[in-house]
C-alpha cells in the first residue's frame, strides 16, 4: 500500500518525469493485485475496507470493497437475501414469535437489519403471515447458522396461528410505511401484546371490533371444545385505535357493533 501511495505522489509531483511510464506500469499492476483486497476481506472490518479504498483508489475490486462497507454498516434483510449475501430460514412459533435462522454467504461479517413492517410470508395459505413490530439488528460473524429473535405480530387475521410446520419467506410489507409510523408510538405507549396485535390488525387487515375478537386464550387443561377467553376487549381495542389515530392512520373501519 505504501508503494501505491508513493507512486501516486510521484506522478502528481513529476507528471512529465523520466520514469512516468514505469511508474504508471507499476501502479497498474498494484491496482490489479488481489492481495491487498483479500487482506482487508480477511480482517472483515469497516476500518480495513476503508483503509484499502484510501490506499488503492481505482483498484479493480473497489466496488466490492464499497459493497462490503455497506454490508458492515447494516443492510435490509430483504436486500441481503435478494443479493444472495445471506440465507434465511424461518418457521412459525405461535402468535407472538417467529423462529428465524440466518447465515452469511460472503467471506466477511454482515450486519442485517429487519425493519418494522417487514413481512414473514407463510408458505401455507391457511397460516397467518407475521409482521415485525420493532426493528432488529444482528451481526452475522461466521458462516454458521445463527438464531434470531425478532419482535413480531400476526397479520391476515382470519387465518390460523402459525406453527412449527409453517415456513416463511421474507419480503417488505405493503403497509410498511404506516407500520413504521405506528410501531414507535405503540412502543412508546408501553402497551401489552393484545393492544399491539390489535393495532397491527387494524393496519394490515382493516379489522373492526368483532374481527379483533378472534384473538383468544385457552387454558392448557381446557377441552378442545372450549372456545377460550377474548383477549382484545373494548379497552384494548380503543387503546389500539387511539394509537393508530395518533399515527395518522384511518380507523373509520373500526366499529363497535
Which residues are covered by each model-predicted region?
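Asparagine-centered strand-capping/turn motif at beta-strand->loop junctions
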Residues: 17, 90-92, 96, 100-114
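Mature extracellular/secreted ectodomains of secretory-pathway proteins
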Residues: 147-148, 155-253
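Short solvent-exposed coil/turn linkers within tandem alpha-helical repeat scaffolds
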Residues: 11-25, 53-64
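TPR/TPR-like alpha-solenoid repeats
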Residues: 27-30, 34, 69-72
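Intrinsically disordered, low-complexity Pro/Gly/Ser/Thr-rich segments with frequent PxxP/GP/PP motifs
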Residues: 119-166
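Buried hydrophobic-core signal for structured, non-transmembrane domains
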Residues: 10, 52, 100-102, 200
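Low-complexity, acidic Ser/Thr/Pro/Gly-rich terminal tails and inter-domain linkers that flank the onset
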Residues: 70-93
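Disulfide-bonded cysteine-rich modules in secreted/extracellular proteins
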Residues: 1, 32-44
Amino acid at each position: 500500500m505504501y508503494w501505491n501511495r508513493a507512486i501516486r505522489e510521484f506522478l502528481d509531483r513529476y507528471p512529465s518525469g523520466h520514469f512516468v511510464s514505469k511508474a504508471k506500469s507499476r501502479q497498474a499492476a498494484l491496482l490489479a493485485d488481489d492481495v491487498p483486497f483479500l487482506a482487508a476481506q480477511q480482517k472483515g472490518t469497516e476500518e480495513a475496507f476503508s483503509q484499502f479504498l484510501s490506499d488503492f483508489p481505482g483498484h479493480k475490486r473497489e466496488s466490492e470493497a464499497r459493497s462490503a462497507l455497506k454490508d458492515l454498516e447494516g443492510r435490509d434483510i430483504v436486500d441481503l437475501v435478494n443479493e444472495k449475501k445471506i440465507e434465511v430460514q424461518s418457521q412459525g412459533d405461535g402468535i407472538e414469535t417467529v423462529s428465524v435462522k440466518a447465515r452469511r454467504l460472503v467471506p466477511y461479517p454482515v450486519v442485517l437489519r429487519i425493519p418494522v413492517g417487514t413481512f414473514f410470508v407463510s408458505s401455507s395459505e391457511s397460516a397467518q403471515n407475521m409482521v415485525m413490530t420493532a426493528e432488529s439488528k444482528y451481526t452475522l460473524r461466521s458462516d454458521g447458522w445463527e438464531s434470531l429473535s425478532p419482535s413480531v405480530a400476526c397479520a391476515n387475521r382470519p387465518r390460523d396461528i402459525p406453527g412449527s410446520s409453517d415456513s416463511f419467506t421474507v419480503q417488505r410489507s405493503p403497509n410498511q410505511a404506516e407500520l413504521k409510523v405506528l410501531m414507535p408510538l405503540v412502543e412508546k405507549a408501553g402497551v401489552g401484546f393484545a393492544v399491539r396485535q390489535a393495532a397491527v390488525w387494524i393496519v394490515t387487515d382493516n379489522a373492526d371490533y368483532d374481527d379483533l375478537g378472534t384473538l383468544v386464550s385457552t387454558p392448557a387443561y381446557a377441552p378442545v371444545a372450549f372456545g377460550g377467553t377474548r383477549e382484545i376487549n373494548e379497552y384494548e381495542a380503543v387503546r389500539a385505535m387511539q394509537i393508530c389515530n395518533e399515527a395518522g392512520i384511518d380507523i373509520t373501519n373500526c366499529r363497535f357493533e
